From Swiss-Prot:
Name by which UniProt lists this protein: RNA-binding protein Musashi homolog 1
Gene Ontology CC annotations of this record: cytoplasm; cytosol; nucleus
Residues recorded with modification N-acetylmethionine: 1
Tissue localization of expression: Expressed in neural stem and progenitor cells (at protein level). Detected in olfactory bulb, brain stem, small intestine, and at low levels in brain cortex, hippocampus and ovary. Detected in neural progenitor cells, including neural stem cells.
Entry keywords, A to Z: Acetylation, Cytoplasm, Nucleus, Phosphoprotein, Repeat, RNA-binding
Length: 362
């Protein structure tokens, strides 16, 4: 009989592997638990049978689980190359428990501090947080190329209780700048499978990830300056915070001249010189720059390459908001701004290294 109770077919992270349980994929929407039990009953005695259903619509999700009394039933199912149920080919496999997902750390002695001003030093950070309790270590993450810190770092306190007190205040003021403080998390928590690493995004000039409020992604290489109470050596940090990776792509110039649609706008409309020059370009078939013709008076030139026209102050979201850009990024870039130059600020994607932490997370 179908059941609306919570379905135990999906194993909990700590469930041991049951060699008698099978995952059945590719089920027809019409397949019932009775039909599933009847089909697999020919291979052995079925102990448990489940068709997984949506808790709201009660519609089949297209897969289920079958547990045999002994492993011989599983072997017989696997020995048969093709299985068909309710006029649909199904895919039975041995079921394995889901791998445990890393859990967020709730008790820790280490905090992440982000949004520091460029003139803030590690001594400034340590001095500020000493008002909450004893600071064991403080560090800022540096770009080894420019030898300037990236605006964030970590502080380790003597006890977890001090961290709780610090994190009760989400934003702190250090050197006349509001900085963000949160509990540091292990790398496995902050960089799960399928993170945004490698996704191309463009950062507006003069803006960093803290201004955008974007989630943070682990940097491949940072070096850290640490407070003198303890030295850190080695690579591979135990903690990491997520920043998007950034790159600017420049569209190549087309090799052939780009001419307007001849039937729409006659070349003679632009004057004899323009018509002659365009005709000469067609004959030569070469040139380092494409020919472009101005649109008729009163029309608005289309924007190309995702950049604004030189006289349009439009919103930043239109400037950098490509169709495949994350909505989480574009939602923060909405203020009107004059069209920028092609120069960009310093890149966050340079060669960086990070030091290891010594509290068991690496």
């Amino acid at each position: 009989m179908e059941t609306d109770a919570p379905q135990p077919g999906l194993a909990s992270p700590d469930s041991p592997h049951d060699p008698c349980k099978m995952f059945i994929g590719g089920l027809s929407w019409q397949t019932t638990q009775e039909g599933l039990r009847e089909y697999f009953g020919q291979f052995g005695e079925v102990k448990e049978c489940l068709v997984m259903r949506d808790p709201l619509t009660k519609r089949s999700r297209g897969f289920g689980f079958v547990t045999f009394m002994d492993q011989a039933g599983v072997d017989k199912v696997l020995a048969q190359s093709r299985h068909e149920l309710d006029s649909k080919t199904i895919d039975p496999k041995v079921a394995f428990p889901r791998r445990a997902q890393p859990k967020m750390v709730t008790r820790t002695k280490k905090i992440f501090v982000g949004g520091l001003s460029v003139n803030t030093t590690v001594e400034d950070v340590k001095h500020y947080f000493e008002q909450f309790g004893k600071v064991d270590d403080a560090m800022l993450m540096f770009d080894k190329t420019t030898n300037r810190h990236r605006g964030f770092g970590f502080v380790t306190f003597e006890s977890e209780d001090i961290v709780e007190k610090v994190c009760e205040i989400h934003f702190h003021e250090i050197n006349n700048k509001m900085v963000e403080c949160k509990k540091a998390q292990p790398k496995e928590v902050m960089s799960p499978t399928g993170s945004a690493r490698g996704r191309s995004r463009v950062m507006p000039y003069g803006m960093d990830a803290f201004m955008l409020g974007i989630g943070m992604l682990g940097y491949p290489g940072f070096q850290a300056t640490t407070y003198a109470s303890r030295s850190y050596t080695g690579l591979a940090p135990g903690y990491t915070y997520q920043f998007p990776e950034f790159r600017v792509e420049r569209s190549p110039l087309p090799s052939a001249p780009v001419l307007p649609e001849l039937t729409a706008i006659p070349l003679t409309a632009y004057g004899p010189m323009a018509a002659a020059a365009a005709a000469a370009a067609v004959v030569r078939g070469t040139g380092s720059h494409p020919w472009t013709m101005a649109p008729p008076p009163g029309s608005t030139p289309s924007r190309t390459g995702g950049f604004l026209g030189t006289t349009s102050p439009g919103p930043m979201a239109e400037l950098y908001g490509a169709a495949n850009q994350d909505s989480g990024v574009s939602s923060y870039i909405s203020a009107a701004s004059p069209a920028p130059s092609t120069g960009f600020g310093h890149s966050l994607g340079g060669p960086l290294i990070a030091t290891a932490f010594t509290n068991g997370y690496h």
